[in-house]
């Protein structure tokens, strides 16, 4: 009896040892924003087998690619990525488990009558239907886990893309803002000189009106640019997990090279872009669900054995089989639902694929047009700046008045601002094209693992 009690205790301890335990997970009580760039995560994991990890230097101007990496490493919205991956892995684990066998035990104590012994009965059964669908269920769960990973990678790409575009806009926006302030300074100086001349009676008051109009337009443009810069900085700080007041230097953008031929890149685009890969995996998972639903048409079937003893000490035992009679429910609804889901995913994938191909070709056409516009605008800006330099020399020699010089200088600044705007549009389009082609970003997730 003592050995029996020890055995029961050991078995109970073994069962409890394999059980999960509860641990509290308190919520945060305040923000977790970094107050400076150096406080961010800066180590980029290896993105290819055998490649070393690298650390982003935050003590020098950042290029737009590094800004994108910092956003992926530190974006508050991406902090839930490890949790989503853990949920998918847990679902896969659950689908990988076979159903537990069912056991039943009953005991009937002898209370009176002609019986000689207590009665008891025991049975053990296993659901065969769950075993039949085990392979398809596990494969579907594995594909769903891979789909989650591809979706999470696409989220990283979108965050990196948004950060790179913001960094590009901030760089060119600052260049335009500096030029706009220079133009405003020139106009302000010219307005003051004309005002002095009109007060002295050397110029008619009508000469002041166009200058005031130009100055008001320049003030509005500078104010609008300043507000846009502030909004872009706040958006970028939010992506980086920084306090909204943090500012840092952004290096001149090095734009990705344009592909010489789109055909080979479009040919394997479905295997390279994470969102298309995720849709393919989702479709394959839905296809396995269809197979599982078809197998589920067969009635539930459980087999096992039972053993019993009655009050007269007569013992019996033998196999058992329990099954449903598929008179009403033959899993028709589940089969129809899984087929409809598979068809929906098929159509969604085709729609996304068509959109991807159309977007790539459209962006390529825009780049060709913008490249020509940038060349023309750069030539015009250089010509205007050359004329402005000649005007300054003429003014220094006394061969030109202040008003004419200001006109030449503001025209040169306007031309350069127009060229910068076109360069920014070209850069945005080129960066967008690289992502649409599935290029320029890692093919593996780089979000840091969850802290234990």
Predicted regions, residues:
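Terminal intrinsically disordered/low-complexity segments used for targeting and assembly
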Residues: 2-70, 226-268, 432-452
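Periplasmic alpha-helical coiled-coil/stalk elements that build and connect Gram-negative outer-membrane
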Residues: 3, 134, 143, 150-268, ...
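Small/polar, glycine/serine/threonine/aspartate-rich low-complexity segments that form flexible
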Residues: 50-60, 101-133, 137, 247-261, ...
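Transmembrane beta-barrel architecture of outer-membrane proteins
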Residues: 66, 119, 165, 210, ...
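A glycine-/polar-enriched beta->alpha junction
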Residues: 69, 73-80, 86-101, 114, ...
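A short glycine-centered flexible hinge/capping loop motif at secondary-structure junctions
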Residues: 198-202, 395-399, 436
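C-terminal hydrophobic structural anchor segments
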Residues: 370-399
